[in-house]
């Protein structure tokens, strides 16, 4: 792949956030966007290049991981710290649970001066993300004995069953979470935000491109050094 040395906007890392940012910017059709990802780009959802464990929404993926481990403390063993190294980042790797959280967090952030982060102001974006990421509830046929046993056990502790785990104003409750699984496939952020703009002429995706330095001039990042095909490549954001 011939990597352009200049682009309008550079996005480093195609994790969940990077995929969303690059996809949204490229959809505006007014600037060239380059997305650099240290791991491989397996292409769109129908490319047939995706490893089975990254697609399978019923298991936690084990491949294409950075291999981080926690430090051993007080004689305790190291623990794996799963961080995906592939297009879509950890949205290509995780348990597909879609939980919005509590209004308390968002309203607290806004009270600290972060305007626009109140629960009511972020709520429309949650609905939009749910639609784009194909978030849905489990079908009755998908509910396993484990799910049922877990929910029943939690109810016995006094925590009530809730009809909607994503009610920002429901402060406690148990239920089976919504998931971003489409036809048994983990519907990751790359599928949701990059696939629609892959061929529009405004987005370039460079997989296996490890950024090892961001160059800053006058408090503004203007270029990066990336290792591509074992060579250091300088790419500018104009």
Label each PLM-derived region with a short phrase.
Residues 1-238:
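N-terminal redox-cofactor-binding region of secreted/periplasmic oxidoreductases
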């Amino acid at each position: 792949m011939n990597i352009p040395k200049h682009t309008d906007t550079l996005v480093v890392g195609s994790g969940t956030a990077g995929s969303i940012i690059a996809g949204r910017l490229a959809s505006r059709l007014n600037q060239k966007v380059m997305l650099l990802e240290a791991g491989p780009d397996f292409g769109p959802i129908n490319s047939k290049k995706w490893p089975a464990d990254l697609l399978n929404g019923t298991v936690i993926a084990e491949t294409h991981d950075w291999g981080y481990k926690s430090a051993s403390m007080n004689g305790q063993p190291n623990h794996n710290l799963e961080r995906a190294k592939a297009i879509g980042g950890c949205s290509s790797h995780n348990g597909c649970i879609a939980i919005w959280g509590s209004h308390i967090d968002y309203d607290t952030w806004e009270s600290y001066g972060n305007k626009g982060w109140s629960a009511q102001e972020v709520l429309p974006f949650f609905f939009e993300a749910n639609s784009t990421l194909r978030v849905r509830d489990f079908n009755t046929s998908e509910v396993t004995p484990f799910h049922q046993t877990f929910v029943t056990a939690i109810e016995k502790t006094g925590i009530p069953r809730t009809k909607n785990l994503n009610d920002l104003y429901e402060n406690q409750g148990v239920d089976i979470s919504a998931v971003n699984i489409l036809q048994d496939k983990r519907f990751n952020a790359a599928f949701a935000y990059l696939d629609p703009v892959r061929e529009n002429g405004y987005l370039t995706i460079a997989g296996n491109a490890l950024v090892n330095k961001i160059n800053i001039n006058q408090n503004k990042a203007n270029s990066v050094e990336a290792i591509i095909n074992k060579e250091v490549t300088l790419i500018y954001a104009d």
